[in-house]
């Protein structure tokens, strides 16, 4: 049990709709992350999907959080959606190195979110494995059901890449997939309404049981951040997992 760590957070921290529920009304937005990091121990940064943060921004994030806080960074859409992993490994490495320079020990790893049109083939599997930088922890979230198979889990495990489980309003399994001995990753997007639906306490209790049975490090992120469902669910799961 001593090696077990659970990191819980949301896919972002700057949600204005949380003001009055999570953030105090008088709290300036520049202090949001510091306040957030006092309540939760991880955040998934989705803004990097659209633009690369400056070193100043990354350093500010690092200084605003405690020693045990972790950031998970989404890989840019130019890599995953526009070029569809038809990239050189150096492109990924350059981005990852830029992020690591600013976040240092606060960097948890990198999330590759792939589009629904990116289906399983042996060629695409190789693209995934060749796109990651093995110097970092890499997680892949697929959006097509063809990736949910044991061969994929096995190949990714051999390369040290984590398969992200997902709760999403699509015909995709919401099972918590554990394909790595040391790391578990799960994203909750809201069901039945994407980004909007709140998970019930009973659903979170089941998830907590799964997390607590895993002896490695778990990363759980709520992306149902339209309004307060995500932050509410994250705080509830934190209590259940303590």
What are the residue ranges of the model-derived segments?
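Residues lining hydrophobic/aromatic ligand-binding pockets adjacent to catalytic sites
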Residues: 1-242
């Amino acid at each position: 049990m001593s090696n077990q760590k659970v990191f819980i957070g949301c896919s972002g921290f700057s949600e204005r709709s949380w003001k009055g529920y999570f953030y105090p009304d008088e709290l300036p937005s520049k202090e949001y992350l510091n306040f957030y990091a006092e309540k939760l121990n991880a955040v998934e940064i989705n803004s990097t999907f659209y633009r690369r943060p400056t070193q100043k921004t990354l350093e500010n994030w690092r200084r605003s959080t405690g020693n045990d806080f972790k950031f998970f960074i989404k890989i840019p859409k130019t890599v995953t959606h526009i070029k569809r992993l038809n990239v050189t490994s150096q492109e990924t490495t350059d981005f990852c190195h830029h992020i690591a320079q600013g976040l240092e020990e606060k960097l948890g790893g990198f999330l590759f979110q792939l589009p629904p049109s990116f289906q399983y083939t042996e060629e695409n599997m190789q693209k995934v494995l060749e796109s990651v930088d093995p110097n970092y922890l890499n997680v892949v979230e697929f959006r097509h059901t063809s990736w949910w198979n044991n061969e994929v889990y096995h190949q990714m495990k051999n390369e040290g890449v984590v398969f992200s489980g997902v709760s999403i309003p699509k015909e995709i399994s919401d099972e918590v997939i554990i394909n790595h001995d040391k790391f578990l990753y799960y994203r909750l997007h809201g069901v039945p309404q994407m980004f909007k639906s709140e998970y019930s306490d009973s659903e979170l209790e089941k998830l907590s049981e799964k997390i607590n049975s895993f002896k490695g490090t778990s990363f759980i992120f709520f992306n149902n951040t339209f309004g307060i469902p995500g932050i509410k669910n994250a705080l509830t799961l934190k209590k259940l997992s303590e």
